[in-house]
Amino acid sequence: MIARRNPEPLRFLPDEARSLPPPKLTDPRLLYIGFLGYCSGLIDNLIRRRPIATAGLHRQLLYITAFFFAGYYLVKREDYLYAVRDREMFGYMKLHPEDFPEEDVYCCGAERRG
């Protein structure tokens, strides 16, 4: 059996995620998920044979809000998982510096030394 990455069952966002900054409300991922909510409202009108763009504007707004809210927590979880992965990677790099030699950094116009 494969061990799970997060041993705590049913934890969407651990308490450790509170230390991260919240995603910006103008994050393109959030705006895209809100747009998907709007499209789902249009598809709902299409399936129920209502006028697509004009019927149920309150319902479309509800879909946008619900998708945006769910997307906010999905983006927050994604940021948390990336932060955990980065912490593990940098911890490994700190413990094994011989595997990661520092390369010489030079500018475009400068001559390379060595």
Swiss-Prot record:
Keyword Transmembrane: yes
Primary residence: mitochondrion
Sorted UniProt keywords: Electron transport, Membrane, Mitochondrion, Mitochondrion inner membrane, Respiratory chain, Transmembrane, Transmembrane helix, Transport
Location(s) in or outside the cell: Mitochondrion inner membrane
One of the Pfam families matching this protein, by short name: NDUF_C2
Membrane disposition: Single-pass membrane protein
Function text: Accessory subunit of the mitochondrial membrane respiratory chain NADH dehydrogenase (Complex I), that is believed not to be involved in catalysis. Complex I functions in the transfer of electrons from NADH to the respiratory chain. The immediate electron acceptor for the enzyme is believed to be ubiquinone.
PANTHER family: NADH DEHYDROGENASE [UBIQUINONE] 1 SUBUNIT C2-RELATED (PTHR13099:SF0), NADH-UBIQUINONE OXIDOREDUCTASE SUBUNIT B14.5B (PTHR13099)
Quaternary structure annotation from Swiss-Prot or TrEMBL: Complex I is composed of 45 different subunits.
Family: Belongs to the complex I NDUFC2 subunit family.
Full protein name: NADH dehydrogenase [ubiquinone] 1 subunit C2, isoform 2
Gene that encodes the chain: NDUFC2-KCTD14
